[in-house]
Amino acid sequence: MKTLSSVLTGLCLIGLFNASESYATPTEPQPDVQALASSPQWLTTKVYIEGAPQVDVKANYPGVVGISMWDPQRNRYEFFHADTGLSKYADGGGGYFLVTGDQNTHILVPDVGPVKTVVRRLEKLDKNEFTYSREVPRDMVAGNPPVRIYVVHTPYIGPIKTALSN
């Protein structure tokens, strides 16, 4: 019995110290929703259409351009005009947000306005960049064919100070 116990203990130790790396699969770093808290404000720095990242089309998509604030502790967000700092809350620019468990989808639930949810694909999220994509009508004009836009944000360090309404 003592021999069997010694053999089993030895096999367990060999297994622990010689663990096969073939079982480990490398994964892409996952976005961390807490990275939204790394900057008090985020500024839209670029908008581009899928397949054309070199062409900035911010001027065609003013509804997605501005300063945003995110509170991951309360899951609250709010958008502001980049030129004035005025809130877009009354126009549906504030409410709750969530990131799905797989860290791939970013969902907004505005407090007010006709839109009930906005589903966005989370492309990149770290302390230096927050990028999402979603399908919208080209140039945000109803009836135009859908395109996937990518909206890139970086931490805002300008003079405009904003605060969440709720």
Language model features by range: what are they?
Residues M1-L8:
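Bacterial N-terminal signal peptides that target proteins for export
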Residues T9-N18:
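Bacterial N-terminal signal peptides
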Residues S22-G92, N104-N166:
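Lipid interaction determinants
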Residues G93-T100:
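Extracellular/luminal ectodomains and secreted, surface-exposed scaffolds of diverse proteins
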